[in-house]
Structure formats: C-alpha cells, structure tokens
C-alpha cells in the first residue's frame, strides 16, 4: 500500500500533491461552545459526608471548573481554536456587548465568554468566578422560569455563524441535569428540535453531558434524543452519552473532565478514500486513524521582537540567484546529478518518476500472526475503518512511497483478555521493514541467572504489576510537556511560574517498599550467596591453574604437516595434458575440488560431476 507519513515527506513535492501529516490533523481548527444550565438543582451543594472522595462542589461549579481547565489547555496547546461559554436559565440576559441599552433577543441566555480565541482576560475572569467565587454581576442567579431550549440553540447558532463560519469542526457542549426542560409542552419540544436540526445542517455537532443526582437518573429519551441529531451512517461509530453522577462517592468534576476529554480532539482521518482491495474486483473504501501519537512542544508561529511591541511574523520563501535577482517559480527546474552532470526534468517528467501506481491497500496473502516478529515494528500502526465522507481527512498523495504492512485484528474494548482496552477494536495496519531497515546485530547469549534467583524475582515482578497487569498511557501525562505548558500559561496570564510539577511517572517508593521490601531483601541475600559461591569456585580454579603452570611440561612430538593437495598447483598446460591423456579421473576428490576452487568454479558435487566441470573448463579456457 502507499500513504504519506512522518518519515516520507519530500521537500521537493509539489504543493498540490502534499498530504497533511500528523501535525495537520492534530492542530485542526476547532470551535467549542459550552452551554451550561444555571438552575436551582445545579447550584445545590452536595450533602455533607465523611467520604474522602465525595463531591464538594455543586454541579454548576464543577461544570465551570471543567470549562476553565478546558480553556487552559486550549490557550496553550491549540492556540488557534475558539472557545466560548453560554449560560442559560439565568435571571440576567446578555448577548455580546449590546449598544444603546438594547435588551437581548435571547431571554435567560447569558453569553459569559464570546466564541473566540481565549485571551488572558477571559481566562482571568473565568478563574475569578471558579476559584475565588467572585460574581459581581450576579450571573449565577437562576431565573424564575426555565429558559427556552429553542432560544438557547438559536443563540448558539448565531454565535457559530458569526464567529466560526468556516471552521471544519464546530461543537456545542450542553451540561445540564434537567432531562425534561419543557415537560409535556410539545410545541416547545418541536421548536427546539427544529433549531437542533438547523445546527446540524450548519455542521455543528451537539454533545450532551448529563448530570444525574442521587435517586434521580437522567433519562435522555424524554427530550434530548430529538436534540442530539445523529446521522444514521455514522451512528455505528458514534460515542454513547455518558452520565456524570453527583454525590455518589465519585468526583463529579473528574467525571465531567473525563467525559469532555474523550471528545476534546475531533475525529480526523490520517488518510481517507483509500481503496481496500480484498480480492480482484472486490474493493471497499477505508479511512485510517492514528490513535496514539507522541506530543511535543511545537512552535506554532514566529514572533518578531524588533519593534516596540511583539508581533506575529508571516514567513515566505523567495528564491534568488547569484545576481540577486528574484527567480520566478516557472523558471525553476528540477535536476538530478548522474555521473557528475545534472540531468534536468520537466515538472510532468519529475512527477511521473514519483508516481508508483494507484493508491490502494491490496491483500497479497495470509500468514499466521506467530510469524510476525516483535522487532518488525518500524512505524506507528494505523487503525482503519470503513466509512463514508463524514470526517475531515487527507487523501494519500500520488507520490507516496509504497510500503508493506501486516493487517492485524485487535480485540474488543470490553474483552477481558484485551491488553489495550483504551484503543478501538478492528483492523490495524502494522508497517513492516524492508531489507534496508533491518540491521544485522550480533548479540552474545546473555548470562543465565540461577533458577532460585529467577523464582524470587518473579514474586517481586508480580507484586509490582499495574492494575490488571496493564499500562494505560492516558494516566501518565508527559511531565516535560506539562511543565512547558505550565510555564507558557504563567507567562500568558502574568502569574508566578510554579516551583514544581506533579510527575505521575515518578515511582511510588513507599508503596514499592511496602509491597516487595521483604522480597527484595531475600533476593539480595540469595544474590550475595550465589555470587560468593561463584567467586570461591573461580578462586579455586585459578589456584589449580597456577599449580599446573609450575609443573614441567611433558615433551610432545611435533605433528607432521598435512600433505597439501597437488591439484591447486597444476598449470594450464598440465591440465591440458591430463585431459588429452584421460588421467583426470585418476585425481582424488580433494585434488579436483582444489583445482576447481583455484579456477573460480563451483566445487560441489560427486567425483564424476567434478571431473565433468573440470573438463568443460579446460575445453573453454585452455
């Protein structure tokens, strides 16, 4: 197959043929609007309890903290994305900064933060509301009558249309605990469903984050089944609505953050519209996704510091010849050096050299999985899924390098035997190395420890295993990356740089000592005992060798030198005479092989075959 990756990008490829790489789909512009319900039940504090993990914040406080954390992540990691906060069900109403004292056209809707790239002032105002509880404008005051969901959705429609008209991903996050905002009012339900359909037609995806209280479950079928519009074609791969529980010993804040983080990055295909040829004339279209990708601190833009105020710099490339004349793009030709000379190619000729055939994933055979070695992993695996045009993705370019892959099935996420429950189940493309990618490494056999030491170490390893003997990378953030973002965040918000950062990768030494401290001491004693016995045996062996050296050596007879085969020293004239006199058959096999080897002829076979080879060589060369 052929697709573009992070290692095969060619700087000389034409702009129209370039494929979006991993960073392109990771940094897609996204617009998210939080719609948070401000009601009496959302403002109600959880009941007091002695449980350590019990909720201490109200549902509205947890939702605002979640939005604040989401904004912190976006302002640094994805600075081009937009975010806004819309409070509905409030006593006050506001839609942007209205001029002339005009009242808002959306009753009980308060646009706390307009949909835009988060600025430092937006983060500070939200932080004051979340951490310090400062609400001078009395925003968090519930209205006496519920807000119309049709007005809420229409307000969101206006926000997206005005601020993010051309964004590829636009999403509306609704956080509420009211599963029936309009009760049995069918007209209000119908109006809200129409507004939701308008949002869907606009390309806005509505995501619901319901909050359930103790003794009252959130029933999505009462109202929101008609609001969360899902296309039947993508229903099979849609995420289910997860409910966050309050006052049940679980942290509502952590639950909300977990559910929102699962939808934080929009689904974007690594490649799309790739033909998967199962058999001749049997082809389906697949998309590829890269669920695991290493994040690194990336420079998102250039900054010019030469003026009084720092400004974003726009870079452009200009080609200039030795006479300092600007060279037009049409004047530039591509050339390759052969034998010290440059061979020029036309653009269409250079493109034809890079075209290695159509873009296709073709099955060429089947092998057992046991034949796939662990060292064959040369690139990140790609998850493939059959779907239509519902996700944004990049099309594999025509000049992508061909690559051999193994198509491997993975277990279901709910399978207990699955070692990666955080990854989707399906087919994975496992890139295989070519001959140039494999190195010949001579590895000496490692020393084998004693069985007793191995058994004791097995107990230590078993007691230090992670839960379910499984490593989940989502639980261990990159400490250097998090520190980089923390410093940037402090600089952007004019805050003090934190002294230290929580590093989840640091081993828990106390817990390790509590679990295997005794086993480690026993293993160390056994190792000392085995090492002492080994050193003692080596010392005794060395003493025995010293005693043998001090004894006189017995006189040994010199072995006779082996008789060299005479065949290798025969000249061409001697070989010609032997052929004429028919004496080649009298030569031994060793002599025949010696002659053939000296003449560069294969010396493998029986005596009759060797004689025939030698006769043929003499007839052709002498």
From Swiss-Prot:
Subcellular location(s) per record: Nucleus; Chromosome, Telomere
Entry keyword set: ATP-binding, Chromosome, DNA damage, DNA recombination, DNA repair, DNA-binding, Helicase, Hydrolase, Nucleotide-binding, Nucleus, Telomere
Domain Ku: 276-463
Gene3D superfamilies referenced in this protein's UniProt entry, alphabetically: 1.10.1600.10, 2.40.290.10, SAP domain, von Willebrand factor, type A domain
GO CC aspect terms: chromosome, subtelomeric region; chromosome, telomeric repeat region; Ku70:Ku80 complex; pericentric heterochromatin; site of double-strand break
Biased composition regions of type Basic and acidic residues, renumbered to the chain: 1-13
Domain called SAP: residue spans: 584-618
Positions of region (Disordered): 1-26, 537-572
Biological-process GO terms, alphabetical: DNA recombination; double-strand break repair via nonhomologous end joining; stalled replication fork localization to nuclear periphery; telomere maintenance
EC number: 3.6.4.12
Catalytic reaction annotation: ATP + H2O = ADP + phosphate + H(+)
Pfam family, one: Ku_C
Known function: Single-stranded DNA-dependent ATP-dependent helicase. Involved in non-homologous end joining (NHEJ) DNA double strand break repair. DNA-binding is sequence-independent but has a high affinity to nicks in double-stranded DNA and to the ends of duplex DNA. Binds to naturally occurring chromosomal ends, and therefore provides chromosomal end protection. Required also for telomere recombination to repair telomeric ends in the absence of telomerase. KU70, of the KU70/KU80 heterodimer, binds to the stem loop of TLC1, the RNA component of telomerase. Involved in telomere maintenance.
Subunit details: Heterodimer of Ku70 and Ku80.
Similarity-based family: Belongs to the ku70 family.
Name of the protein: ATP-dependent DNA helicase II subunit 1
């Amino acid at each position: 197959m052929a697709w573009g990756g992070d290692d095969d990008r060619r700087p000389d490829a034409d702009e129209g043929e370039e494929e979006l790489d991993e960073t392109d789909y990771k940094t897609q512009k996204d617009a998210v609007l939080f719609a948070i319900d401000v009601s009496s039940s959302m403002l109600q504090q959880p009941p007091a309890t002695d449980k350590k993990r019990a909720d201490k914040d109200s549902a509205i406080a947890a939702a605002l903290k979640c939005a604040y954390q989401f904004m912190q992540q976006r302002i640094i990691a994805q600075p081009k994305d937009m975010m806004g906060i819309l409070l509905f069900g409030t006593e006050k109403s506001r839609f942007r900064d209205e001029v002339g004292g005009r009242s808002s056209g959306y009753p009980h809707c308060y646009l706390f933060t307009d949909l835009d790239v988060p600025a430092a002032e937006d983060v500070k105002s939200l932080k004051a509301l979340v951490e310090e509880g400062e609400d001078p404008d009395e925003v968090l005051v519930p209205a006496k009558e519920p807000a119309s969901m049709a007005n809420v959705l229409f307000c969101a429609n206006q926000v997206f249309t005005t601020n993010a008209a051309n964004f590829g991903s636009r999403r509306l996050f609704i956080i509420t605990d009211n599963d029936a905002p309009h009760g049995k009012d069918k007209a209000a339900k119908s109006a809200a469903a129409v507004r939701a359909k308008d949002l869907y037609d606009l390309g806005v995806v509505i995501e619901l984050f319901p909050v359930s209280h103790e003794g009252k479950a959130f029933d999505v079928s009462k109202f929101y089944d008609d609001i969360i519009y899902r296309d039947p074609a993508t229903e099979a791969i849609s995420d289910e609505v997860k409910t966050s529980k309050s006052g049940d010993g679980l942290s509502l804040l952590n639950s909300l953050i977990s559910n929102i983080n699962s939808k934080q990055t929009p689904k974007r295909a690594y490649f799309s519209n790739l033909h998967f040829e199962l058999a001749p004339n049997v082809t389906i279209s697949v998309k590829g996704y890269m669920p695991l990708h290493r994040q690194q601190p990336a420079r998102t833009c250039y900054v010019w510091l030469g003026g009084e105020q720092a400004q974003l710099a726009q870079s452009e490339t200009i080609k200039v010849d030795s006479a300092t004349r600007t060279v037009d793009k049409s004047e530039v030709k591509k050339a390759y050096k052969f034998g010290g000379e440059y061979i020029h190619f036309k653009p269409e000729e250079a493109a034809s050299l890079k075209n290695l055939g159509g873009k296709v994933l073709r099955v060429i055979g089947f092998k057992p999985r046991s034949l796939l070695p662990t060292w064959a992993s040369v690139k990140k695996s790609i998850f493939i899924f059959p779907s239509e045009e519902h996700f944004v993705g990049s099309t594999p370019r025509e000049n992508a390098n061909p690559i051999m892959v193994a198509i491997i099935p993975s277990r279901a996420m709910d399978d207990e035997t699955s070692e990666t429950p955080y990854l989707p189940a399906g087919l994975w493309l496992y890139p295989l190395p070519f001959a140039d990618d494999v190195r010949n490494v001579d590895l000496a056999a490692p020393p084998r420890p004693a069985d007793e030491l191995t058994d004791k170490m097995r107990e230590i390893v078993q007691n230090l295993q992670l839960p379910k003997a499984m490593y989940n990378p989502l639980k261990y953030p990159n400490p250097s990356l998090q520190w980089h973002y923390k410093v940037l965040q402090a600089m952007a918000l004019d805050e003090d740089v934190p002294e230290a950062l929580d590093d989840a990768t640091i081993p828990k030494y106390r817990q390790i000592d509590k679990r295997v401290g005794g086993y480690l001491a026993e293993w160390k004693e056994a190792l000392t005992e085995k090492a002492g016995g080994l050193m003692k045996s080596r010392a005794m062996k060395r003493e025995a060798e010293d005693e043998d050296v001090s004894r006189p050596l017995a006189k040994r007879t010199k072995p006779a030198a082996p008789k060299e085969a005479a065949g290798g020293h025969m000249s061409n004239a001697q070989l010609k005479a032997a052929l004429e006199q028919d004496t080649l058959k009298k030569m031994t096999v060793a002599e025949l092989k010696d002659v053939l080897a000296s003449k560069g002829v294969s010396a493998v076979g029986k005596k009759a075959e060797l004689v025939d080879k030698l006769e043929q060589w003499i007839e052709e060369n002498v």
